[in-house]
């Protein structure tokens, strides 16, 4: 088990998609109306707060669902959670996860281990770039940020190095329990549960966005 920050390793695989200057993050849940919309929009919000001057084409953040409610709006409680964080919920429509989404993605972050398994089962060499959100957070925390390329080299270059380093840590840095890698589904739950899930997602995203950008986030 890793005992401290590790360098960003090479040779652990890389994204299958995108040009050298573009990095795509795909968030996956079941219906694409609760967890993955919250995660997508909180990721965008956090990136914009830290990298306001980075072209939008450098980091593209999307989401889809394994049983996606194609064309549906996000749940009202999900939109309310985003409003709590000051994040934009407008213009969202649900999508069903397709092969093309996985092919294009440089990093796939799922709500649960079952979602991760479903993405990997689609093929497209997705295994080395697909993690649950909380799994990726745990691995990222063990990576020495000083070993990642500086932001001056481009945010996409830094992001790809981060994914390679995280993939190299698999099997060495295990979850304390299977449930530790899960974000539970709030579908149909009251707003209080949605808010607890929103906080959980935000806390998991913070070290990921910090590692991607090299910028610590402002306090909420």
Question: What is each model feature region?
Answer:
Residues 2-9, 13-15, 120-220:
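Phosphate-binding/catalytic loops
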Residues 1-105, 113-128, 210-219:
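Conserved active-site segments centered on acidic
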